Amino acid sequence: MRLKHFAASALLLSALTSPLVAYAADASDLGQSLTPLGGEKAGNGKSGWQAIPAWTGGLTAAQAPRNYRPPQHHPDPFASERPLLQVNAANMAQYSSYLTTGVQDLLKTYPQSFYLNVYPAHRTLAVPERVAENTKRCASTAHLKGWAMDGCVGGTPFPIPHGSAKDKALQILWNHITRFRGVYVIRRASEAAVQRNGSYSLATNDQEIYFKYYDPKVKTLAELNNVLFYFMSVQLAPPRLAGGAVLVRETLDQRAEPREAWGYNAGQRRVRQAPNLSYDTPIADADGLRTADDTDMFNGAPDRYDWTLIGKKEMIVPYNDYQLSSPAIKYRDLLTRDVLNPRPQRWEMHRVWVIEGTLRPGKRHIYSKRRFYVDEDSWQIVAADQYDSRGALWRVSLAFPKEYWEVPMMWSTLDAYFDLQAHRYHVMGLTNEEPTEFDATKPTPGDEYFSPQALRRRGIR
């Protein structure tokens, strides 16, 4: 099995050594030959399932279904489309150059349960004009500061990756970490760890996120005060944990100032600072299937790995997954045995940056190597391959993005984490059985709202 993993990795590596783009672009190309965030505006000139269309502005409220009112569940703007292709274990060999290593292993491991329905591609990414303007400015001012990013606020810092392969990889990773996901969003969502026999239990939370980095009132890094975002979550289920709460102060430069986290215990009615919520710390609600830095495909300081850019490639990845959050689909139908139900999943051909991190000598992490596939338009990591200490592929992570046109922003509607060795998986971001999805319509609170004192008040409600 290890030899198969290494062989597949070698084949993918060889296929990616020739990037599909030149790196001679500059900031003046943003909004011209490049999209406002740095993707190639042109399509690939191919047809059928291989076609990548030109970017023409994305999916905004003006083009969205007219019957939508935020924060309702989004109707699928592509509901009338049918798959152009189905990739499964029997035919995957002829499409392997378009598949991530992890997806290939999922197909091999679950030949009766997993397949990809490949639809026409739509480049739906749209962002507010101010984010586009800030990104153009950041293209000339942002720079790496060791493992950190400096010189940018309110935009994508490195829309045109440049420099060495290591520099480009770190810049792409920072684009993912700082990508636009609104300013203040709230939602009620569930997560579940699905066991080998298909059983699961839901953990449900009320969540609030304030992306201070994108607050239009914050104009300078000094005003930002090294805060990327605040995250507050109050547990609703299961009953034994109800009333507990978590607050995270996510810093931009975590080597200079590590993230801070606090937990409120409803039974003890006490707020305590968490000693460690980073790197490979296991997440309790994930039943050991997700580390702290697995969340959002990757988060936190990138300093435990040596990063390199492998290249840019056209690949079949999850995209425009409106069906996965449809209220017509119940959790019991979505959370199927072995893998997340593939029927409502939508896969499309898109260009992705492929970067790889190898654990640095003397550093500790349960993953010896990580490979990320980053959407060129949104800078969202859409797939991740995680390797164990022996060098064998261990876990496969998939993000299922869609455009939230009312903001507008692109974010994953849910994330799934598959353990190929334990034959279990974890899903977070479930909203199908909730009355609403993300609500980005509420006024933005200030820093004082996200304090340990406020955490206790939220937890006891």
PLM feature spans:
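Sterically constrained small-residue positions within well-ordered secondary structures
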Residues: 5, 15, 78, 224, ...
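Bacterial N-terminal signal peptides
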Residues: 9-19
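Signal peptide processing junction and immediate N-terminal pro/mature segment
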Residues: 20-24
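Solvent-exposed N-terminal domain segments of exported/luminal and surface proteins
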Residues: 27, 31-258, 265
